[in-house]
Each structure stands twice: as C-alpha cells, then as structure tokens.
Amino acid sequence: MNKRFKDYINKKAILKSGLFDKKYYLSTYPDVEKSNLDPLTHYLQIGAKEGKNPSKEFDTKYYLKNNPDVKEIGINPLVHFLRYGAKEGRNPNNLFSTEELVAKGILQLSRD
C-alpha cells in the first residue's frame, strides 16, 4: 500500500473515531498553525512524535508508556489504538477505558 493511500485511510479512520479534536489541538498547541500543515496531518507526521495529544480523550504519552510494543514498532499511537488497541482492551488514557468512551458516545469504533 503506498504512503499516500495509507495516510488517507488513517485520516479517515481517525476522523470517524471522534478522537481527533481540531479545536483542542490548535488551542493546546498554537505552534501547529505555524507549520502550514492541516492539524490532523501535523499530528500524524509530527505531533505524536512530540507527545502531543489529538484530543482530551487520547493521551499519546500515556499510551506509548503503557504499550512499549507500539513505541518499538514505530506506528502512530492513535492509529494503533484505532486499528488494534481498542479491540485488544488497551486504554487511551488513565481516566477512561475504551468501553467508557464508547458508552459515552465519544469514541466510534469501526466494525472491520
């Protein structure tokens, strides 16, 4: 799968999930506007590596600390969570479980 198509699929899954909050991301990290990148693209390419959170509901540093295998393979932590982690029972932060976020309607998991 080529990188452009993979990026498209990842962005689509993230937007559908509800775990990327553009307003939160821009207000929490004002430097993002200076990057000339769309905020979601910034998170995927730069922000996650810097430990930035895509929303209040997903803690990038927490997820990587508690899932060292994710850090080791180098996949974006939010992408990993949506593809595998949620189904494996991994939590997106230290405040809520995956089940709680789904029950509250914050997280939308795909059925694939």
Where are these regions (language model features)?
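Charge-rich, low-complexity intrinsically disordered regions
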Residues: 1-112
